[in-house]
Amino acid sequence: MPRPRAAKEEETELLAQHQESPRPSSDGSEASASSISTTSLVLEHINDGGFNGARSKVSEKYTDDGNGDLGHARERFDIEDGKFHPLTPVDKKARRTLWIVGTICAVGWALALVSFLMNGNYKHSSTRPHDPDASVTKGSGKKITLDNVLGGQFYPQSQSVSWIAGPKGEDGLLLEKGVSGKDYLVVEDIRSKGNTEAAGDKFTLMKKGNFQIGEDIFIYPSNVWPSADFKKVLVMSEQQKNWRHSYTGLYWIFDVETQTGEPLDPENQSARVQYASFSPQSDAVVFTRDNNLYLRKLDSQKVVKITHDGGSELFYGVPDWVYEEEVFQDNSATWWSEDGKYVAFLRTDESMVPTYPVQYFVSRPSGKQPDAGKESYPEVREIKYPKAGAPNPIVTLQFYDIEKSEMFRVDIDNDFTDKDRLITEIVWAGKSGQVLVRETNRESDILKLILIDVSKRTGKTIREENVAKLDGGWFEVSHKTTFIPADSSLGRANDGYIDSVIHEGYDHIGYFTPLDSDKPILLTKGEWEVVEAPSRVDLKNNLVYYVSTERGSMERHPYVVALNGTDKREVMDHSGPAYYDSSFSTGGGYALMSYQGPGIPWQKIVSTPSNTEKFEKVLEENKALEKMVQKHELPILKYQTIDVDGFKLNVLERRPPHFSEKRKYPVLFYQYSGPGSQQVQRKFEVDFQSYIAANLGYIVVTVDGRGTGFLGRKLRCITRDNIGYYEAYDQIAAAKMWAAKKYVDAEKLAIWGWSYGGFTTLKTIEMDGGRTFKYGMAVAPVTDWRFYDSIYTERYMHTPQNNPTGYDNTSITDVHSLSQNVRFLIMHGVADDNVHMQNTLTLLDKLDVAGVENYDVHVFPDSDHSIYFHNAHKIVYDKLTWWLTNAFNGEWLKIQKVRPKAQADARSLGR
């Protein structure tokens, strides 16, 4: 398939031999006469067709050069243009005037030279630091290629840090696995990286990356989890993926002192386990196998089976598909109490949940070979998948008393019914024998926080909030509730917890104490929002660390505040815009600060305000990325806000290098638009959108419209019960603004997105009907929200039974309006277990019935939602590039009037 590529080396070498006089570059600056600059000037016209003969329109790139063809450019600098004029004498007055003018010019030239040298403009672009706020590209550089982007060549290098608490509560300890030159699994004091005398010794947990069981079994770890006392390591080998977050494996217990291992279940060592975890006391392991829960006490070889009826429709200790995907984003539904006396776990009953078949035509993910004679049939995996309005799994919280070997549940007065309950978070309240349980109703707009005393086997609701009455919105799933134990010596009279709260229309954090209090001490407030907070609590110093958007909704900065809500301050001193990701040590004394943009990303570990001993260690500076960036021409980024119906929306415009307002550019809109999401961020990123702008010469615009996150609940929750309407409306409103700009070709506007972005793409071109956007590209789109999973969809739409009109309105049904666009593209993975292929197939049927044909379709066998199977990921982006280039080259306009060649020739002869 044709795809824009860099010029061949032999073409570049030949053109570099052409020496021309300097001419103004496209950004207005004077181009150098070096062979490098001359080559770049000539290469701007390679795609005009003059060098390589006739080329198909499909392979043509849009050019942002408005200077005409190369032949005319050469004529302007040809010394033989025009007639030869003989020299004539100059009189004295004219000579004096020339001297004065010459002197003025010389002085001006000298001043310009000084400014030129002081500003570093004499340097080639490849030697200048990356400037993320540059408004123009100067000089020349390599073009970004699609292979650069898909190959991750512009992806920042980063180091992951696994903080781990010491057996005696030591802070600042790291768990390092497989580091070159070290033992396989090591616990190291972070201060040793700074060579300070206070650093503790390294502690080896596993010397080698493999060990032996018996005479013939060799174990190669897929993952490892140390016990809290560092005396044992839980090892998983032969990992096999299940869904997005879940997997199975063989589990082993490794003894640190003897450096030997044994099976987790000595009597069934080859059985695959779904999840396992150490007790906080390091004396037992609880695990799930075949959907039943088991316990192994390490002082015994015996395994105790806690549950007995687990199976294909009943899960213990692990989530089903929808809870894994939409609630926990994890493979565990098991929680040890801090004192190791109890295990809390979910019982998930899927017996009433309908199944959805996912077909695999090429591969066999089960690993099972079909019976003889059935090899030609696809493998079908039946998934229990609750769609909107369909029966949900029945989930209940169970407890197991280790000492008494008893399993029980605690009933709560006025609790949600089994069919209307979502259990979204479990937090043990220290060693008190109490547990906090967060529940919402099925439609996620009523929250109940329940406190259970497992020793007394009683419980009660301590907080209840109805957000539908507050602002008409919903509760998102959160897993950041943090227990704060009482400590009178530190001024904490009662137990409490930190939780997210809604304050004056924005998401903040509050401290609830005692545990049954429903009135928080506000830790943050203002017209900005905290992000997944708290990040860490320093109990010794009563400090709370969190990340927020206080500096700007497109930025992220870490802060610290006292537990009483006073003395708030920033953790990092950064004067300009910045986007930080923060990972704090277990005690809060250290933090890995990952600066993600807008400049070149870097990482360093620093001491926090909790720590009296100052520490700083740079881990990553991305020097290689800096050099890579300097050698390439990146898009010009313009961050801005626009006003749509009184709402301020964040926008990122990516302009081509050498952008000129005197030219007319096609514009591609890229968006995701999902509830609470954000695409316009001050991060460093060179992605597919960067490639489109920098290589193809198109403008790429991203608008975070209504419904997206971090600008307050009013903007976010307006979409409830009618998702797709405001998202599409805002994309169209923004497109009209761009269409009116003098540097935009209003006939060449397109929009694309993936998943929710694919849905919004189709909804936008459906609403617009070809009046503003002419083209759309949708990958893995939802086309009818009745087809998507219940927990996600009903959070924003209620159930179809309670909101039938909303579901009708939000579905893609106006195929006549779709036919008014020039053309659109749909792509989907056939084995998508998330957004089912049913969405695309149903829309195609509607198009067929209506006789609509102005679209293209590409499906990918055996690919799931990420579309990776058998080179599919590369093909997706190749197809997007090729299809968009054809669109902006006018090819799709031509095929609207296509006729058989014989007929066309006959008409031509008849003229």
Swiss-Prot record:
It catalyses: Release of an N-terminal dipeptide, Xaa-Yaa-|-Zaa-, from a polypeptide, preferentially when Yaa is Pro, provided Zaa is neither Pro nor hydroxyproline. It comes from the Eukaryota. Keywords: Aminopeptidase, Glycoprotein, Hydrolase, Membrane, Protease, Serine protease, Signal-anchor, Transmembrane, Transmembrane helix, Vacuole. Residues 25-39 have a biased composition (Low complexity). The gene is DAPB. GO terms for cellular component: fungal-type vacuole membrane; plasma membrane. One of its GO terms (molecular function) is serine-type peptidase activity. This is Probable dipeptidyl-aminopeptidase B. It comes from Phaeosphaeria nodorum (strain SN15 / ATCC MYA-4574 / FGSC 10173). The active site is at S755 (charge relay system), D832 (charge relay system), H865 (charge relay system). Residues 1-39 are annotated as: Disordered. Belongs to the peptidase S9B family. The lineage of its organism: Eukaryota, Fungi, Dikarya, Ascomycota, Pezizomycotina.
